[in-house]
């Protein structure tokens, strides 16, 4: 098929050339002839975060970026030193894994900090610190979700483990196996019921939101790693560590903890 389509104008009977990647939309009738307008459907987002001129990971010194990183996808800064994305199938898999882990990390970062914030503002929890909360199940009263026994009351670690494995295992197995649910939808951005606010209605705005999601997701993954390290080194939650640092920045910082840390203490 040729790259241009011929459109007959009903206004003057003249022939005009229009790109074939445009979408035909009927808007009215004039003098018995159909009047049509065309809305261009862009093949790539017109955003500074996409394409060959997008920001690179080394700014103006990033000239020799891999040829397979073209800026087609969100979050592509041209950095792949290890060549992990050279194979298209591996690249697609890594993109999916990054988006999924980004979303889990953002939820995790919220779950690690929000209970501590609420606790410091008078909301009572059985245990607000994220890495200590699970141990409440071994207490005599068991584990109450949000400190309320009327919500979720758990007393068996084996039951929680079994439910977690069954539910998550089923969902992940279904996703990887490619069940019929969701056929024809983008596996990463399905839309529909998963977009109740219709944030993806505007393609340009949606392309920007994809970049923002990955930026925040990558930051959240680093944050979760930091929370793990804090828990091991200080034995405190992220909010308590923040308050300690603000109270005495010289004594409570990464350098002082790293130089004084003794494993097992």
UniProtKB/Swiss-Prot annotation:
InterPro entries: Chloro_AB-bd_pln, Chloroa_b-bind
Binding positions (chlorophyll a 5): 212, 230
Gene Ontology CC annotations of this record: chloroplast; chloroplast envelope; chloroplast thylakoid membrane; mitochondrion; photosystem I; photosystem II; PSII associated light-harvesting complex II; thylakoid
Membrane topology: Multi-pass membrane protein
Binding site for chlorophyll a 6: 245, 254
Gene3D superfamilies, per database record: Chlorophyll a/b binding protein domain
GO biological process: cellular response to abscisic acid stimulus; cellular response to water deprivation; photosynthesis, light harvesting in photosystem I; photosynthesis, light harvesting in photosystem II; positive regulation of reactive oxygen species biosynthetic process; regulation of stomatal closure; response to cold; response to desiccation
The keyword ATP-binding is annotated on this UniProt entry: no
Entry PTM: Photoregulated by reversible but rapid phosphorylation by STN7 of its threonine residues under state 2 (red) light conditions. Dephosphorylated by PPH1 in state 1 (far red) light conditions. Phosphorylation triggers the formation of the PSI-LHCII supercomplex.
Domain of life: Eukaryota
Residues that coordinate or bind chlorophyll b 1: 57
Induction summary: Accumulates at stronger levels in low light than in normal or high light; more expressed in growth chamber conditions than when grown in the field. Repressed in leaves exposed to desiccation, cold and high irradiance via a metalloprotease-dependent proteolytic process (at protein level).
Residues the record lists as binding chlorophyll a 1: 79, 85, 98, 218
Subunit structure: The LHC complex consists of chlorophyll a-b binding proteins. Component of LHCII trimers made of LHCB1, LHCB2 and LHCB3 subunits. Associated with super- (PSI-LHCII and PSII-LHCII) and mega-complexes (PSI-PSII-LHCII) containing LHCII and both photosystem (PS)I and PSII, in state 2 (red) light conditions.
Name of this protein: Chlorophyll a-b binding protein 2.1, chloroplastic
Species this chain originates from: Arabidopsis thaliana (Mouse-ear cress)
